[in-house]
């Protein structure tokens, strides 16, 4: 129990059952919102379709997890003729495989759900369910360390935090990592060694950054316990929860990353890239201009500092939560300097449960006026940002998927062949047809899709059987569309047109 736990407010007679049920109802709504958003919008964007595709591929071809190439995707394109048409040379990479930073846990989860249900709806609910479970586990940690009121505050803060809400509604993997590490550290705080090892292993085998985060937190807590001679936990327990997950994860790390010749995540980090990406990552944390994002971080940080300085919890849990956040920030900073990492700050998502608990611990220790202003500001910001993001993504990403569904249905019924389409991951996922495009090379795309001669040679030289493009727009030139009209059978699929290439 925490040192600073406040007494529970008295319950009025006659309203006991309603008051006791309402916090659980609120918690359930907070946890369910991610699944509701996914069911209502159907949004998947960025790497989300790819992540699910890797799961289905792991079910269809288990050797994929052991390093076999994915021969169903050439998203960087086939070799052009002449090669100068693809000046960046990304097509030289050939067929792709499982990312070297990934562990086997997430693909196996997707594979299991698909293998049992064959349902895209349930497949797309895996991460939203994980997000809801993470909110509940965050509540449980805060309830153990604080009280019910602040535990609900922690759950609400996490579930409405724009970055967490967005990525817990689609099939990105950071929320699953957050689930495992939150479960592991809840068990660690409760002294459940076996369950800590189990969930810690799942965290370490989700992504390589989780191995660093989990082991760093445990080492920090063990050193704190030993150096302060508190003896809250036997040294053997610290060693067990640290060593066993690392030993279990070691064969995968050796086989999938080191022996395969993949470089470490920190190799080739760039200070110039860091200076370029970090401001963008700060803005994208709250989907706000940098000065508003920094102001928001200062306000949240003030509550966190108040919780730590006010000793709202005992020393060990405070140290654990602080190390959790600190390592999350460190991993994010390294990510910002890593080539090909992107500008998304989502790698900090597994540390957000700790931020939520410390925020809840400190908010009520701020001066009343400051607390009121900060609360109103965060409620307004989170509400406005989440509404805008949900609406934007429903139009920007949900509508193209819905528009392509007739074409996807037609492709599921046709012979196997590569599909040339800008919706390459979506096509791979929802049709199980191989797909290709010109990802990351707009010059390559323009040279092929806006020149009839180049397009003709490219199509004839490579195993492309279908072309799936929007019915209108400038994705291709009128000359290329005219060529397709003459040499392909068009299947009108609403907003999309599917061309079946006629080859000799």
Residue ranges and their predicted role:
Residues 10, 23-28, 198, 242-246, ...:
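Signature aromatic-anchored transmembrane alpha helix within multi-pass, membrane-resident enzymes
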Residues 222, 288-322, 328-329:
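Hydrophobic, aromatic-rich transmembrane alpha-helices
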Residues 214, 234-299, 327-332:
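Membrane-lumen/periplasm interface segments of specific transmembrane helices
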Residues 28-30, 158, 200, 217, ...:
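Transmembrane alpha-helix segments characteristic
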Residues 378-428, 438-445, 453, 459:
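Membrane-embedded, lumen/periplasm-facing catalytic core of multi-pass transferases
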């Amino acid at each position: 129990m925490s040192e600073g736990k406040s007494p529970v407010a008295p319950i009025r007679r006659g309203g006991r059952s309603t008051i006791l049920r309402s916090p659980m109802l609120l918690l359930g709504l907070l946890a369910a919102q991610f699944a509701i958003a996914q069911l209502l919008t159907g949004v998947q964007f960025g790497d989300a379709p790819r992540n699910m595709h890797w799961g289905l591929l792991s079910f269809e071809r288990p050797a994929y997890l052991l390093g076999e190439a994915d021969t169903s995707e050439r998203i960087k394109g086939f070799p052009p003729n002449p090669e100068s048409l693809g000046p960046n040379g990304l097509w030289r990479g050939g067929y792709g495989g499982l990312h070297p930073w990934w562990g086997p846990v997430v693909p196996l989860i997707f594979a299991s759900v698909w293998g049992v249900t064959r349902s895209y709806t349930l497949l797309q609910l895996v991460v939203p369910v994980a997000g809801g479970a993470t909110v509940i586990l965050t509540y449980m940690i805060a309830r153990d360390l604080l009280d019910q009121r602040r535990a609900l505050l922690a759950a609400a803060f996490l579930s409405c935090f724009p970055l967490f809400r967005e990525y817990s509604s689609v099939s990105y993997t950071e929320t699953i990592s957050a689930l495992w590490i939150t479960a592991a550290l809840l068990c660690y705080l409760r002294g459940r060694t076996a369950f800590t090892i189990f969930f810690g292993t799942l965290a370490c085998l989700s992504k390589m950054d989780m191995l660093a985060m989990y082991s760093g937190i445990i080492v920090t807590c063990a050193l704190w316990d030993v150096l302060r001679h508190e003896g809250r936990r036997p040294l053997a327990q610290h060693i067990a929860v640290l060593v066993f997950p690392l030993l279990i994860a070691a064969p995968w790390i050796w086989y999938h990353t080191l022996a395969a010749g993949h470089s470490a995540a920190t190799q080739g980090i760039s200070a110039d890239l860091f200076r370029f990406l970090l401001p963008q990552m700060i803005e994208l944390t709250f989907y706000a201009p940098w000065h508003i994002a920094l102001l928001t971080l200062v306000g949240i940080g003030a509550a966190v500092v108040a919780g730590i300085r006010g000793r709202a919890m005992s020393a060990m849990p405070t140290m654990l939560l602080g190390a959790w956040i600190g390592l999350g920030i460190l991993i994010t900073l390294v990510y910002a300097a890593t080539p090909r990492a992107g500008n998304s700050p989502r790698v900090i998502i597994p540390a957000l449960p700790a931020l939520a608990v410390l925020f809840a611990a400190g908010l009520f220790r701020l001066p009343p006026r400051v607390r009121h202003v900060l609360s109103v500001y965060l409620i307004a910001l989170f509400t406005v940002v989440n509404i805008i993001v949900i609406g934007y993504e429903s139009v920007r990403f949900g509508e193209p998927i819905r528009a392509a569904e007739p074409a996807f249905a037609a492709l599921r019924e046709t012979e196997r062949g590569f599909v040339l389409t800008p919706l390459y991951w979506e096509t791979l996922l929802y049709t199980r047809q191989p797909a290709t495009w010109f990802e990351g090379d707009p010059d390559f795309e323009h040279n092929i899709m806006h020149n009839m001669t180049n397009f003709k040679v490219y199509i004839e030289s490579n195993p492309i059987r279908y072309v799936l493009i929007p019915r209108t727009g400038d994705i291709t030139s009128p000359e290329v569309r005219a060529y397709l009209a003459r040499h392909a059978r068009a299947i009108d699929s609403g907003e999309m047109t599917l061309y079946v290439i006629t080859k000799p």
